[in-house]
């Protein structure tokens, strides 16, 4: 992890530069620090993505509530440096569902209404855990807020397919997205936007013909 000043020096010039250049698409700031989130929103970001779901900084909820912006809350087991050290759950789907349900309630109590949840594929999960979460993603959709999945180029895809280099995992990423196309997922996070567009254009065409 880096400190707030380092994060600010890295991201604020980029966000401000994009807005100054006339870029109008939504920008999401990925941070667990309220100070960084507030500055990024002031510079032109529209969305806050917090991998700790508000647990790392007690001021995060108030910053997001004041901005009335979308807030992405993710599940992560432990800390980034240790999260993949033998992650263990009794029931990975139900435990993460309960965690996200509690975080939704806490965020709403703080005045946040535009909430998106992310089960945190690859963040403190084994290959088996990740697959179970994807197979039962409807459990998260049942919480009544949009569901985001970030599986692009993840290590578990490489473990299953033998594709070692992350940059070479676009094809298997898109295959998994195609398999998940009928699941109740609202947002996907990808590296290769063009290939993702092809997948969902084909899905739409096929559904239109049925």
Residue ranges and their predicted role:
Residues 1-26, 31-35, 41-42, 46-109, ...:
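Active-site-adjacent loop and "lid" segments of alpha/beta metabolic enzymes
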Residues 121:
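Active-site metal-binding loops of divalent metal-dependent hydrolases
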